[in-house]
Structures are given as C-alpha cells and as structure tokens.
C-alpha cells in the first residue's frame, strides 16, 4: 500500500464502519497478493535456470526452500515489528488526553 492509499484510508473516520472494514480487508488482500508476487519473482529468478517441460528435483527443492525461507523471514519481521510497536508509548493516545 502506498502513502496516498494510507492517507485516504485514514481520512475515512466519518465513513460507515462496514465500508471502512471492507476497505481494510481489501487492502490486506492487496498486500498479500503483492507479497505472493514478490515471492514468486524472487524464487523464480533464484531457482529456474532453464524452463523446461518438467520441474527437475533440484529446482523443486530450491522452490520449496525459497518459499519456506521467505515465509520464515516475513514472520520474523512481523513479530519484530509487533514487539517494537508494543514497547513504544502510543503518542496518539497521549496527544488526545
């Protein structure tokens, strides 16, 4: 999601909560699709030497490993961001008081 999309979504405070939820869900779907596209491109470049009629065992193992490492790394980053976010004081709450 780019900054214009996030600023548009942030300005939806007066919009119907169902619409806001729908937009959030669609944004999450878009992020997931972008992630899958990035993973596919990365693993394809890394694992496919010469496309052929069949996937050889080396390429198959490479794809499996690539996807697993990508998922592990993504999960690690998400967990780290979550920990960082929990440890920082929430400025928006303190500003509204």
Swiss-Prot record:
It is found in: Mitochondrion inner membrane. Its main location: mitochondrion. Gene3D superfamilies: Mitochondrial import inner membrane translocase subunit tim13 like domains (1.10.287.810). One of its GO terms (cellular component) is mitochondrial intermembrane space protein transporter complex. GO terms for biological process: protein insertion into mitochondrial inner membrane. Transmembrane segments: none annotated. It holds the Pfam family zf-Tim10_DDP. It comes from the Eukaryota. The modification Phosphoserine is found at residues 57, 87, 94, 96. Keywords: Chaperone, Disulfide bond, Membrane, Metal-binding, Mitochondrion, Mitochondrion inner membrane, Phosphoprotein, Protein transport, Translocation, Transport, Zinc. One of its GO terms (molecular function) is metal ion binding. It is a peripheral membrane protein. Disulfide bonds join 43-66, 47-62. Heterohexamer; composed of 3 copies of TIMM8A and 3 copies of TIMM13, named soluble 70 kDa complex. Associates with the TIM22 complex, whose core is composed of TIMM22. Mitochondrial intermembrane chaperone that participates in the import and insertion of some multi-pass transmembrane proteins into the mitochondrial inner membrane. Also required for the transfer of beta-barrel precursors from the TOM complex to the sorting and assembly machinery (SAM complex) of the outer membrane. Acts as a chaperone-like protein that protects the hydrophobic precursors from aggregation and guide them through the mitochondrial intermembrane space. Belongs to the small Tim family. This is Mitochondrial import inner membrane translocase subunit Tim8 A.
């Amino acid at each position: 999601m780019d900054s214009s999309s996030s600023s548009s979504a942030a300005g939806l405070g007066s919009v119907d909560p169902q619409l806001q939820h729908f937009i959030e869900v669609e944004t999450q779907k878009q992020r997931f699709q972008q992630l899958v596209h990035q993973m596919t491109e990365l693993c394809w470049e890394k694992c496919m030497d010469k496309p052929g009629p069949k996937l050889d065992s080396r390429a198959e193992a490479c794809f499996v490993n690539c996807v697993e490492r990508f998922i592990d790394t993504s999960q690690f980053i998400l967990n780290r961001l979550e920990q960082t976010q929990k440890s920082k004081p929430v400025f928006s709450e303190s500003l509204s008081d």
